[in-house]
């Protein structure tokens, strides 16, 4: 077994016997009582998890922190009173690096932590690390990426095609959680702000590694109706828009704007237009970003004969933006939504 497989196996051994009570704590009192009860706080289960990892020959250490919901750990005056839980860092001797996990996780997705534990300042309690390496950023342990590739044809008033989606990081974990809840092969991954177009699909395939919960691949064939009004067809070249509403509706902002995590959304779409129609209108390419480039979006569209290709990238490089960036964020979000809703207009020749 590889190092990662051993860590996943240890997590599964824990979860087969014990369940999390929903409580986050910093200390554990009596492991024997926890085992007898069959459940415990994350701290109680984490101590048992560290013992199991030791049986697998893996060294592990606590990583103490203040949860996001209870406030950031002060940079200038870190205090023991501000600490309220810990998670586990398992050490890989071959790569001389750590992977992070917590017993509150539903799935053993290494380095993909519950959002309440995703903080940018946590303390690794390892005697073997120099002082400068004991502060850990738990938000940027891995990449959170959605890559979607769509190949479609417009014919007889319908859009038919094939969609492949590859998910990495938090998106992959959320997808797997939804699969567990539904327990059937009828799930389509959509982000909370995804477009709600109605479509039919078939041939759903989901590919995943039983030991790697940080990645997953989904593909299916789909069919949806194109809007037909007054002899014209109206088609969104994104086919599956990412955003449809602007959550930033306040006129001003006093507190920082906090996102769950940094992420990247990349859509590639190839669209074949129908015979007997010509393009009357087509969206323009567009690029926008914040002054510090922590948020940017590129919408690049090209037409070549009856083929339209679109590359759309939306990337958030940070989990937090300052209040003085709020107006800029509002404007960018509004413009990006306009592009998500932009249509190709086709008229008959």
What name fits each language-model region?
Residues 1-349:
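A sensor for short, sequence-defined functional sites
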């Amino acid at each position: 077994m590889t190092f990662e497989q051993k860590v996943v196996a240890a997590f599964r051994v824990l979860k087969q016997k014990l369940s999390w009570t929903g409580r986050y704590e910093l200390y554990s009192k009596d492991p024997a009582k926890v085992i007898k009860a069959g459940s415990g706080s994350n701290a109680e289960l984490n101590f048992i998890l560290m013992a199991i990892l030791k049986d697998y020959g893996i060294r592990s250490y606590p990583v103490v922190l203040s949860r996001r919901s209870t406030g950031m750990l002060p940079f200038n005056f870190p205090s023991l009173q501000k600490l309220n839980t810990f998670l586990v860092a398992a050490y890989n001797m071959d790569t001389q690096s750590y992977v992070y996990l917590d017993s509150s996780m539903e799935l053993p997705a290494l380095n993909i932590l519950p959002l309440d534990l995703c903080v940018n300042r946590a303390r690794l309690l390892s005697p073997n690390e120099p002082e400068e390496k004991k502060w850990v950023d738990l938000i940027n342990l891995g990449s959170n990426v959605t890559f979607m590739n769509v190949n479609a044809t417009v014919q007889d008033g319908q859009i038919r095609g094939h969609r492949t989606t590859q998910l990495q990081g938090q998106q992959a974990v959320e997808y797997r959680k939804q699969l567990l809840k539904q327990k059937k092969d009828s799930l389509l991954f959509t982000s909370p702000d995804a477009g709600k177009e109605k479509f039919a699909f078939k041939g759903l395939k989901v590919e995943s590694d039983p030991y790697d919960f940080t990645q997953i691949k989904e593909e299916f064939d789909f069919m949806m109706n194109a809007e037909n009004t007054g002899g014209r067809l109206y088609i969104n070249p994104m086919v599956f828009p990412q955003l449809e509403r602007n959550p930033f509706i306040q006129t001003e902002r006093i507190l920082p704007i906090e996102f769950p995590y940094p992420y990247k959304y990349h859509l590639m779409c190839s669209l074949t237009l129908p015979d007997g129609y010509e393009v009357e209108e087509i969206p323009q390419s567009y690029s926008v970003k914040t002054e510090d480039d922590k948020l940017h979006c590129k919408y690049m569209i090209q037409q070549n004969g009856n083929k339209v290709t679109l590359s759309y990238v939306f990337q958030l490089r940070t989990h937090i933006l300052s209040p003085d960036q709020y107006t800029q964020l509002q404007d960018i979000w509004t413009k990006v939504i306009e592009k998500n809703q932009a249509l190709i207009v086709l008229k008959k020749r």
